[in-house]
Structures are given as C-alpha cells and as structure tokens.
Amino acid sequence: MSDSGYELSFSLNTLNHLSEGLYSNILRFYLKLVANAWDADATEVSINIRQDEIVIQDNGIGMSIEDANTKFLRIGHQKREDSANTISGRHVMGRKGIGILAIFGIANIAEVYSCKDGVPHGFIIHKGDIERGISSDVTLYRPSSVPQEALSIESGTKIILREIKSSIGNAEKTLRTDLARRFTIINNNCNFSVIINNTPINDNDRDYLNKVQFLWYLGGESSKYANFFTKLKKSFEITNLGDGMSGMTVKGWIGTVYRPSDIPNEQPYHIYFAHGKMIQEDILIDITDAGLYRQYIIGEIEADFMDSDDEDDIITSNRQRIKQTDPRYLKLLEYVKIDIMRVIASTWTKLRKEYPSNPKKEEVNDSSLSKDSNSSEKENTNASSDSSTATENASSDSSTATENASSETNDGEVEDNSFFDDDIPEPSPPPKQEITTAFREMKNLVKNSNIPNQMKNIILYDIQQAAYAYKGTSFKACIVMLGAILEGVMLGTIQRTDVLEYLIALPQVPKPLSDLGPRNPKFADRTVLAQYIGTTFSFQDCKEIIELCVQGTNKLGVDILQTVRNSIHPGSVLKDMKQLARFNHQSAVGYIAKLHEIINLVILWNPPSIP
C-alpha cells in the first residue's frame, strides 16, 4: 500500500462510547452472552445473579488465548467469515463482532476464564484502566492475565462481572420472561438450555401460554403451536406464502389474546426471529390499520432469510430492529400485512362473538395443561393475497369481509368497524363490580406509569369522572368521557377544553354543540360537558365519536387530521392532532387497551337499545 500521507486512527474513547451506546441496557448483555454460548456449541449456559456480581458460564468448546485475542477481544471480528456454521452444525448467531462491548456497557470489572482442548487461561478487564488510557490517548489496551495456579475452569467459558453499573433489581423474575421470549432455541428440541439461579427456563416462562384465544400458524411445519397453548379455542393454518416470497421460508404463529391487558407493555409480544434469535420486537410497528383486533395481537414469526450470510446485514447497529428499507424486509412486511393480518382482521370479530372472551370464567383442570387435552379445533385457511378475508370455509368472497364488519380502505388497509355494531349479541351481562374493577385497574395502570405527574393527575381525574358518569349520569356520557380520555392520553398534553373543541371539529357532532363555539367556559369541566352530551347526543352519535377516537389513535391521527382540516373550528385542534401523529409514548398502548376493555364491558352491560 502506498504512503499517501493520510492515516485513519482510533481512540479507546471510541470503545467507551460504543459500549455505553449499544449495550448500556443489561438485557442486551444477557442476550449477547446467550448467543455467544450458542455459537460455542454449548448445550447449557448458566446465569447466577447476586447482589454485587453476575456469573455466566457455558459448557461450550471454549477459547484458546489466540481465540480470545483475535475474536473475543477484537472489535469488529466477523464471525461468519470463519464459518456460517459451528462445528456441530448450528447456524452462527453473532455477526458484527462487537460482543465485548456488552461487558463494557454494564460492568466496571470483568473476569474471563476459558478452557479449550484442556488448556485453561483467564484475564481481567478493568474499565478504569481503559478510561485512564483514554485520557492518555492510548490506542491499545492489554487486560491483566490470571496466574495458572488460580485457574480452576476445566471446559467452556466463564465470565464474572463485578461493580455492575445497571441496577439488577428484580432481575431474575423478569429475565426469565425476557430470554424465553427472545430466543426460540431454548427448550425447542435444540439441545440448548438456559439456567438462571439453578432453575432452567421453560416454556411457561413466556407467560402467555394460557392467554391465547385464537391461533393462526404459518404452514404445516408450525402446526405444533396448535397444541402449545392451554386455553386455545380455535386454530387455523395459513398456507399461502404470498406473491414475491418464492424460495423464502416463513414459520411461526400469530394469535389473539382474551383481553388486551393480557399483553404487558414491558414485554415483547409480537416478534421477528432469524436463526432462533430476536431481530425485531414489534411486528406491527410498520403496519398501520384501524382494526381493534391489533390490540389483541401476539405472535412469533421466524424468517431466517432475513439474516442471510450471502447478503448485507439487515439488522441495525444496536441489534434491536430491522433496516426498514431493505427489500427482504419490505417483502416480509407485505406478506404479514396482506396474507396474515387481513386474514385475522376478517375473522376475529366473528370468532369473538362465537366464543367466550373471558378465560377466568371457565373451569380449567390441571389436566388441561397437557397437549392432548387442548380443546382447539384446527381448520386450514388458505390465505389469498388478493383477498382480505379468510373465514372458516376459506372463502375468498369479498362479501365475507362485510359480514365480519371489516372493510378495506382506499390504501388497502383493513378497518375493523365491528366494535360498535348494533348487532352485538346480549350475553350474560357482566356484574357492575366487574366494571368498577376495570376502572380501578386502569387507575392503577396510570398511577404506576412514568408519565409526567401533571398529566397523570388529569388522566386520573378524568377516569374518576367517567366512573361517576357511568354510575349516575348517563351511559352515553360515560362513553364520550372515555373517548376524551383516550384522545387525551394520545395527545400527551391535555387541556380539558380541548375535548370540546375536538368534538366541535367532528362532522358527526350535532349543530347545537357546534353553535356553542370553542372553549365555552360553561363546559370547561368535563363532567358538565358529559352531562350535556348525555342528554343531547343520540346513541349513534356517541358510537361514532368514540369510534373515531379509536380509529384515529390506531392510525396515528391521519384520518382525524383530515377531518380537522375541513372543520369549522380547526384552530389549535389541528396543532394538537399533529402532536397526536408524532406521539410515541411507550405506555400509551397499555392505556388504550384498558380503555377498550372498559368500553367493551360498558357496552355489554348497556345494550345498544338506548335511544
């Protein structure tokens, strides 16, 4: 190479910044170390969490000193350049060669011990030494070695972390679910187990086996999932792979839970996998539609072609999501949207009417946990990419979508308008205590959230007023009040008079309220407004208002924005709706799910015969 007079250099400070940015979250550290154990052909990796240290040990092939220097301690080592498969034939999970950053990101001291071919060795990394090297502009760091007489490891690799920077907290309880949901290789006939504090992770640690009501599995190879869930009511097979997916294998399942509250915010509940490891937590993040069903969605989609050795890395640098513009992702996204979600949207409402929606009301014996006792009925559903329906008879007749109260918008997205259909059957009404409990649960959800206190207090006040409206004012007032809360949560900044201005902007609102003008002091208190609405609006008006709220939040305000632009009082409402379109609060989904649940209970208790 000719001497051009230029050179590219790196500082240890780069290492420091990368570790803090990519692996400051302790969960990412665990994910990386479990993946490393898999790549080392381990059959077992143990994690022991103590108050002042974390110990991770596997029984893999181990590292030699040369391996440690050229692979483990080398930033940017490309694992798959050596081989895409391990000695035992496993596909390698690691790719970028930045695993060492996982250690630097969460601990100040790391002891690493390994033994390969009967030769043990060990070294100790001190974050403080690296930081001192940064101040001295040092470009090379040499960990201190462990004397041979102090080595006791006989096989595999052992890492001990001390001076943990992240709070361990209730680590064991949440870590089981975290790992169980982010790897498909654990306890899945892959000869690989993860043990936390001497107790192996099992399928129950996924914490949703008894929560899935309906299941759609992808191809015959995924039919095992029909026997996986303990309270499953019905399962369907989606056999069509979709246009443009030739040569690509997609496996897994999508299900719907009994209640939105069965899906906790802090855990991933619909995930993309490749080669047994999570590559993106949210399947629906780039799929927008107005269907209520999506609040109930849970699932796992396995697409190994998304992490092909022969193509560019599709995962972002933080290893948490897929690059949105990659053609492979766009094809998969289209398949999920057309051939999976439309199928679910067109059948879910009918299934919910046909089967009970509360598993707690059913008596389930311990024997029901066995695979053979599962009462699910299997049906094959051939998903058609040019049809938005898939009923029990696998009909592609477009009228089926209308019967199931799902309609297709101009842009091809499916709207689920069934939530407020007048033909809702009248099941045994839930006790009023159940509705009261739902309000109480929602209040607790808000109280325990991390939203600003001022906003939290306003939302809590509105929940209480909605409860009062239900008890003594008007069912219709309660519904509109809940819609106002729903809107307010998504706005992020709530002004009580904004709800009046918002209602004025909707063309469905009767003229008497429109004539009041914006921000009328008489209606500054939502209780008064709710009382007025309860005596002025028809039941259909209330349904349309709350339906627009639900539709608008799910579609990030796109439809509402258009409505507001054409309204007689756009003003600050347009500004607020733009805020809604940008709003991305991680807790909002949970609030909305609970609101849907409460509204559903209220509607069941007060059937649509109210004038």
Curated annotation (Swiss-Prot):
Region (Disordered): 355-434
GO molecular function, one term: endonuclease activity
Species assigned in the record: Herpetosiphon aurantiacus (Herpetosiphon giganteus)
Lineage of producing organism: Bacteria, Bacillati, Chloroflexota, Chloroflexia, Herpetosiphonales
Ranges of compositional bias, category Acidic residues: 410-425
UniProt-listed Pfam families: HATPase_c_3
Name listed for the protein in its UniProt record: Putative type II restriction enzyme HgiDII
EC number(s) given by UniProt: 3.1.21.4
InterPro entries xrefs: HATPase_C_sf
GO BP term, example: DNA restriction-modification system
Extent of Basic and acidic residues compositional bias: 355-364
Function text: No restriction activity was detected upon overexpressing this protein in E.coli.
